Amino acid sequence: MSGRRVGAYKEPGDDNVTETAEELGSSRPFVVEITVRGYETDTQGHLNQAVYLQYAEHARWSLLQAAGIRQSAMVERRIGPVTLETTIRYKRELRAGDETQVSCAFLWGEGKTFVIEQTVTTADGMVAAELSAVGGLLDLDHRKLLPDPRATFRELATEPTLLSLG
């Protein structure tokens, strides 16, 4: 699954992306654009509920990649992101051919977990869904959460401001 402008920073209604990551810092959420495909719809003719999770996952990995975090680097360190909880609030249906923007922002607290807030919007700026996920970084050998995922992401990232770590 790929967005047309993976890694674009834009708000609904913006036609051009002209700012660099450095200019924006973490002032606006990271956004990927995805066109709803016909095979992703269900018998009601709207986007199948499970596909929202795929769109959210695509945006999260695109953000990590834009921040300079490679999946291979995590595998080499024997760590990986894990989702512990996800809540989806459906606001408006999406149909085949609809252009969407999926935003992604990491929110940091203390401890082993973090929150990822995401919004799926239509081309005209209407909110189609809101997603909130609790995640962590798993030690792949010991099968336990790392005590400080924030510090680990900061070490791995070449653009930590994209993850609100600047």
Region spans (language model):
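Intrinsically disordered, low-complexity regions enriched in serine, threonine, proline
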Residues: 1-4, 57
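HotDog/MaoC-like acyl-thioester-processing domains
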Residues: 3-32, 65, 93-96, 106-166
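Early exported N-terminus immediately downstream of N-terminal targeting peptides
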Residues: 32, 50-52
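Short acidic, Pro/Gly- and aromatic-enriched capping/linker segments at domain boundaries
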Residues: 34-36
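Active-site helix/loop of acyl-thioester processing domains in fatty-acid/polyketide metabolism
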Residues: 52-75
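Helix-adjacent hinge/juxtasegments
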Residues: 75-80, 84-106
